[in-house]
UniProtKB/Swiss-Prot annotation:
Short motif (DEAD box): ranges: 248-251
The keyword ATP-binding appears for this protein: yes
Motif Q motif positions after renumbering to this chain: 95-123
Residues annotated as binding ATP: S139, R140, T141, G142, S143, G144, K145, T146
EC numbers on record: 3.6.4.13
Species in which this protein is naturally found: Emericella nidulans (strain FGSC A4 / ATCC 38163 / CBS 112.46 / NRRL 194 / M139) (Aspergillus nidulans)
Compositionally biased tracts (Polar residues): 1-29
Short name of one Pfam family: DEAD
Domain Helicase ATP-binding per the UniProt entry, residue ranges: 126-305
Highest taxon of source: Eukaryota
Protein name: ATP-dependent RNA helicase dbp8
Cited Gene3D superfamilies: P-loop containing nucleotide triphosphate hydrolases
Protein's UniProt keywords contain Chaperone: no
């Protein structure tokens, strides 16, 4: 996105004529943003000023046709006021949200967020959802699935706002938080009241929010099922009137086996209105057999047929074309040393990176080890309290930490544009998990690299991954860098070994990553 024009640069473009009025010569710095007000849905005057109240470019005089074209192009790239953003969105070409019958206030809101053109999944799903059809949408990571279901929900809610209009279920707390924040941002021009219901926070405060009849509930299935079972009828009565239900990352929500969320999902869906009384939307990056089976379900009487679309879900399209997939062969005993060297090379030393492990134990140990070796690192895994998970993720988003060590709780849905490197410290057991992990980089057309540390026992796993993604991994190369030689050079192995032993001692002594003794609460008898 091009930088915003400054008031000084704008003033230089203004053509000064001898008969200019006093109003036209007024300093642009003295202009004030319009007051917030709410009018009809179709009126462009109902939009408030953006946080940086620079003047509208519409006051600039036309010098020539070429100058006007340049100014118009800059205006399209740099929306200043929400009213201007609305005009940009409505005057765009056919490949726009306007062409999808999206409400003007939503077009303006999306434009202020620099979302001007719909992606393939958005073009396919938004019109059909607005028609009232149930939907199954499959598209690779980073393709804009959240907006594909958020925009229709907000538009249909605005037509008849009442109680709890929609419930969005998602498998992880971090993804739920991200969806919650995105809905708040898109619905900023309206009086939308979303609520976040996830584990790790006080149930009593959540029960009060649920009883307050919010408009949209974003939840993890386990915590919402807890409220349905224990919080009382009055608290969850509003869920009985829900009109739209979304299962985001549906493949994970519906997968059977150990650790399955399916029982909690069934508890939630059985309490909500039946399929004939609600609109159900499923979105996923990997269409599993469980999700595909829903296509052949009998049509609900009185409802239009289910709309099913698969965009970029074939093997060759499961990872972005701008992603470079590489591997490094490592001995089992020196895996930590290779990771340390990889993160410290000339091309990677400044990159924002996510390092994935298979277990929380590995993530905890690796964070301590990398911190001891001088890396700015934080972690994200299920053993951490929710408040710490939120703060660690916020630190990583703000670049206060350069490296995030995480389990697969961070592999789904999280959109952190600054991430340009993903490292699989341990090869995932499921090829679909690899797809979700590497999808944290190279998002929305950006470039990125995924490096997998491969041991002698991981060959079959790598072959399965290559078959899943439809491409071969190439050996990691960096000009002037020999990872193996750097690992063997000097006392690096001793330093890494000492850091690992120190980290293991901290864990055994019950200390946190900063070396502080954890205070365990004693049970009251």
């Amino acid at each position: 996105m091009a930088p915003l024009s400054t008031p000084e640069s704008i003033s230089r473009e203004i053509s000064v004529s001898s008969d200019a009025s006093a109003d036209e010569s007024t300093s642009l710095d003295q202009m004030r943003a319009p007051k917030r007000r709410r009018l009809s849905e179709s009126s462009t005057d109902s939009y408030t000023a953006a946080p940086a109240p620079l003047p509208s470019l519409s006051r600039i005089k036309k010098k020539s046709s070429s100058t006007n074209a340049t100014s118009s192009r800059k205006d399209d790239e740099n929306p200043v006021l929400i009213k201007d953003a609305l005009e940009i969105g409505l005057n765009a070409e056919e490949n726009s949200f306007k062409a999808l019958n999206v409400a003007p206030w939503l077009v303006g809101s999306l434009t202020t967020m620099a979302v001007r053109k719909p992606t393939a999944i958005q073009r396919a799903c938004i019109p059909e959802i607005l028609k009232g059809r149930d939907c199954i949408g499959g598209s690779r990571t980073g393709s804009g699935k959240t907006i594909a279901f958020s925009v229709p929900i907000l538009q249909k809610w605005a037509e008849d706002p009442f109680g709890i209009f929609a419930v969005i279920l998602t498998p992880t707390r971090e993804l739920a938080l991200q969806i919650f924040e995105q809905i708040k941002a898109i619905s900023a021009p309206q009086s939308m009241k979303p609520v976040l219901i996830t584990g790790g926070t006080d149930m009593r405060s959540q029960a009060i929010e649920l009883a307050g009849r919010p408009h949209v509930v974003v939840a993890t299935p386990g915590r919402l099922a807890d409220h349905i079972n224990t919080s009382g009828t009055d608290t969850v009565a509003g869920l009985k009137r829900v009109r739209m239900v979304v299962l985001d990352e549906a493949d994970r929500l519906l997968s059977p086996g150990p650790g399955s969320m399916l029982p909690d999902v069934e508890t939630c869906l059985s309490f909500l209105p039946g399929p004939s009384q609600r609109q159900t939307l499923l979105f996923t990056a990997t269409l599993t057999p469980e999700v595909r089976a829903l296509k052949s379900m009998p049509q609900t009487p009185g409802k239009p047929p289910i709309f099913v679309t698969e965009i970029s879900t074939e093997a060759k399209d499961t990872v972005p074309p701008t992603l470079r997939t590489t591997y490094v062969q490592v001995p089992l005993t020196h895996r930590e040393a290779f990771l340390h060297v990889l993160l410290s090379t000339e091309s990677n030393i400044t990159k924002s990176a996510i390092v994935f492990t298979n277990t929380t134990k590995s993530a905890d140990l690796l964070e301590r080890l990398l911190r001891s070796l001088g890396h700015r690192v934080t972690s994200l895994h299920s053993l951490l309290p929710q408040s710490e998970r939120n703060s660690n993720l916020a630190r990583f988003r703000a670049s206060a930490a350069r490296v995030l060590v995480a389990t697969d709780v961070a592999s789904r849905g999280l959109d952190i544009p600054s991430v340009s490197l993903v490292v699989n410290f341990e090869v995932p057991r499921n090829p679909d998990d690899y797809v979700h992990r590497v999808g944290r980089t190279a998002r929305a057309g950006r470039t990125g690299e995924a490096v997998t540390l491969v041991g002698q026992r991981d060959v079959q796993l790598v072959l399965a991954i290559e078959e899943r993604i439809g491409r071969k991994m190439v050996e990691y190369e960096e000009e002037g860098v020999n990872l193996e030689a750097r690992v063997a050079k000097g006392s690096l192995l001793k330093e890494v070994g000492a850091a690992k032993r120190e980290a293991m001692v901290e864990i055994d002594e019950g200390r946190d990553v900063l070396g502080r003794k954890r205070n365990k609460l004693k049970k009251v008898r």
